[in-house]
């Protein structure tokens, strides 16, 4: 990359960042927090945060990067995608209802507490099983890629660990005070550190817990933008330190700065991967919607499907194995736009932007229903479900649409199963006479009124 090429890219970069930041800041001033603001921040992080880091790696350390024209294509496609997404998100599909909806379900205190206990048991129970099978992998494995090897059993159980976070979200939303806020941080980060040590370097639970703590603080007005920026810097440094421990790196001086740049870029902003994918566009055999279906394979026990493929060919694995011919053991993230390109080429980019706009619009609708709900127990469940889906939104921006669909369906199934089981247990306890009638009566006083939307 020459200085002239850098100047051209920087102009496009500046226009794109100002465009997205302006729209995001306007939305932030209007509502403080919604899923459009969240997705926009994650989108900026994924596709634009890495550009300065890439430039420092090129000019400070002489690192070879994807040819500039493909980086330009990546930047232009990301900007066009966001524009189409934003128009779709802001388009009103139907007029507001003048008549209230009939509530689909309601909640009481016992059912709500049973729900979060069941969610926590799912997480703690699967962590315990994984630990009994593998021990503390952080101290047993000599490389992070071995987490995905046959030496590690019960890998599918890792999908359940995350449900500790929505469980603690229910606890927070039942109280919604500063003490509950800090309890959420302490409990979820402690659990995240435990899973980091047991799994051998997976940082997702820690990142999500800290991020949700900040988002809640913004919604409640307990955190300012300056505090958020400082927390972001702290989070980046913390993730870098955890990455060093995960990969067993011991660096200092210029090497430490170089390692910080490329690990931070690869962790938070794998935007160069999109340029690399576009560079190899002619090698892609478009997969259609098959990667979405294949990503569900990991949820099917081998006992039910003995011939189940051990390796799932989703867009990330297809990009890594078939396009790049990389078999190092780690999948290279294609990003949201890259996953669309793998599935259907550049024509899937605007179609994907429309789909993502509708997805984020639905999450915001559900979140607003939770905030407007008069039954505080049902409100806690709805808001916990929405905030609990933040991890899936991160997966959407960073990993791709196929990974998002499988994870959000899995999240809905497990969350819904715990909710239904909680209601069943309440019915059994009530039938057995274990529920005090006074508690039921007081709960009925807080049942939703005719203005409820769910």
Curated annotation (Swiss-Prot):
Top-rank taxon, per record: Bacteria
This protein's record includes keyword Cell membrane: yes
UniProt entry keywords in alphabetical sequence: Cell inner membrane, Cell membrane, Membrane, Transmembrane, Transmembrane helix
GO BP terms in the entry: enterobacterial common antigen biosynthetic process
CC per GO annotation: plasma membrane
Any single Pfam family the record assigns to this protein: WzyE
Subcellular compartments: Cell inner membrane
Topology of this chain in the membrane: Multi-pass membrane protein
InterPro entries: WzyE (IPR010691)
Cysteine pairings via disulfide bonds: none
Pathway where it operates: Bacterial outer membrane biogenesis; enterobacterial common antigen biosynthesis
TM region positions: 3-23, 39-59, 61-81, 119-139, 154-174, 180-200, 201-221, 222-242, 340-360, 377-397, 409-429
Main localization of the protein described in the UniProt heading: membrane
Function according to Swiss-Prot or TrEMBL: Probably involved in the polymerization of enterobacterial common antigen (ECA) trisaccharide repeat units.
HAMAP family tied to this protein: WzyE (MF_01003)
UniProt similarity note: Belongs to the WzyE family.
UniProt subunit comment: Probably part of a complex composed of WzxE, WzyE and WzzE.
NCBIfam families, per the entry: PRK02975.1
Protein name: Probable ECA polymerase
Annotated source species: Yersinia pseudotuberculosis serotype O:1b (strain IP 31758)
UniProt lineage: Bacteria, Pseudomonadati, Pseudomonadota, Gammaproteobacteria, Enterobacterales
Gene name tied to this protein: wzyE
């Amino acid at each position: 990359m020459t200085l002239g090429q850098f100047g051209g890219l920087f102009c496009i970069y500046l226009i794109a960042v100002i465009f997205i930041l302006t729209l995001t800041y306007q939305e932030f001033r209007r509502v403080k927090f919604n899923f459009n603001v969240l997705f926009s921040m994650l989108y900026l992080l994924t596709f634009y945060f890495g550009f300065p880091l890439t430039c420092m790696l090129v000019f400070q350390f002489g690192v070879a990067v994807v040819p500039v024209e493909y980086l330009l294509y990546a930047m232009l496609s990301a900007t066009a995608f966001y524009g189409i997404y934003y128009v779709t998100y802001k388009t009103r599909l139907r007029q507001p209802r003048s008549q209230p909806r009939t509530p689909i379900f309601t909640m009481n205190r016992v059912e709500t507490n049973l729900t979060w206990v069941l969610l926590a048991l799912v997480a703690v129970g699967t962590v315990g099983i994984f630990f009994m099978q593998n021990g503390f992998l952080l101290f047993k494995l000599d490389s992070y890629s071995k987490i995905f090897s046959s030496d590690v059993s019960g890998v599918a159980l890792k999908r359940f660990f995350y449900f500790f976070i929505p469980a603690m979200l229910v606890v927070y939303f039942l109280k919604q005070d500063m003490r509950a806020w800090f309890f959420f941080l302490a409990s979820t980060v402690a659990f995240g550190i435990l899973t980091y040590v047991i799994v051998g370097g997976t940082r997702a639970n820690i990142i999500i817990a800290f991020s949700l703590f900040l988002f809640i603080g913004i919604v409640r007005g307990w955190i300012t933008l300056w505090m958020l920026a400082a927390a972001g810097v702290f989070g980046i440094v913390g993730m870098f330190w955890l990455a060093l421990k995960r990969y067993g790196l011991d660096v200092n001086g210029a090497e430490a700065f170089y390692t910080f740049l490329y690990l931070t870029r690869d962790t938070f902003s794998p935007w160069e991967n999109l340029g690399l994918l576009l560079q190899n566009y002619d090698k892609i055999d478009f997969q259609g919607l098959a990667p979405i279906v294949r990503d569900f394979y990991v949820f099917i026990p081998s006992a039910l499907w003995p011939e189940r493929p051990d390796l799932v060919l989703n867009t990330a694995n297809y990009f890594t194995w078939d396009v790049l011919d990389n078999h190092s053991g780690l999948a290279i993230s294609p990003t949201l736009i890259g996953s669309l390109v793998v599935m259907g080429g550049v024509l899937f980019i605007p179609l994907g932007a429309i789909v993502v706009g509708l997805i984020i619009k639905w999450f915001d609708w559900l979140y607003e229903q939770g905030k407007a709900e008069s039954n505080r127990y049902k409100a806690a469940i709805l808001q916990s479900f929405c905030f609990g889906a933040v991890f899936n939104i991160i997966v959407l921006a960073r990993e791709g649409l196929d990974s998002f669909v499988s994870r959000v369906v899995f999240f809905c199934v497990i969350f819904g199963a715990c909710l239904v089981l909680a209601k069943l247990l309440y019915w059994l306890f009530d039938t057995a006479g274990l529920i005090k009638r006074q508690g039921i009566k007081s709960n009925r006083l807080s049942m939703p009124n005719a203005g409820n939307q769910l």
